[in-house]
Amino acid sequence: MKIDIVPTPGRLLKRYKRFLADIQLPDGAELTIHCPNTGAMTGCAEPGSLVYYSDSGNPARKYRHTWELVETPAGEFACVNTARPNQLVGEAVDAGVIKELQGYPLKKAEVKFGDQNSRADWMLSGSSELPDCYVEVKNVTLCLHGRGYFPDAVSTRGQKHLEELMSVVRNGKRAALVFCVNHSGISVVSPATHIDARYGALLSEAIEAGVEVLAYKSEITPGEIRLTQKLEVTPFDSEAF
């Protein structure tokens, strides 16, 4: 995925009100940009980090610039724009990168599914040999000692999605949860049970019920992101803290 990044990054001054961030440009000027991420962004919003952002070119927008990537003080890249993971996974399915989700001629975004009338990020269909597959995508940027965790804050929405995926399996369809790992420092993924205990419990329940849980890591450079590497998903380890 190509991203039209403004050539010169800024330095993060602060993130606030969830959807806003102030950055300092190389000439010393300050700019307020849109932060498309409702999570805690732990480790990805440290003052002084390099912020790579895009420009919509739309003067009618109150905040025409959007925060896309961050380079942490440790030199690691992360994609903080939560609109990107769905696109990345869709591209990776089309390119054959996610082997587990091949064999479907049709792919549709934002399809209603489940008992609670949620929307799947993708529905794969049209196979004469495989049941339709409902795919939920989650962005993973919380990195602690090389391990990625999801969620980075208590997520009732994430809990609901796991319940919906289990209902899909009960009804004879396929359900897949794809952790889109958008932090260069992550080498393995686990549920953040220390942050959201119910999510961790539901993930274990979902795996037992037959929901397929996958993790794929992106290769990030300023201007381009693409999924390239499958990672292991392991249980939460309390001894890691």
Swiss-Prot record:
Family from the record: Belongs to the SfsA family.
Alphabetized HAMAP family for the sequence: SfsA
NCBIfam families: sfsA (TIGR00230)
Name of the protein described by the UniProt record: Sugar fermentation stimulation protein homolog
InterPro entries for this protein: SfsA, SfsA_C, SfsA_N
Gene Ontology molecular function: any one: DNA binding
Gene, per the UniProt record: sfsA
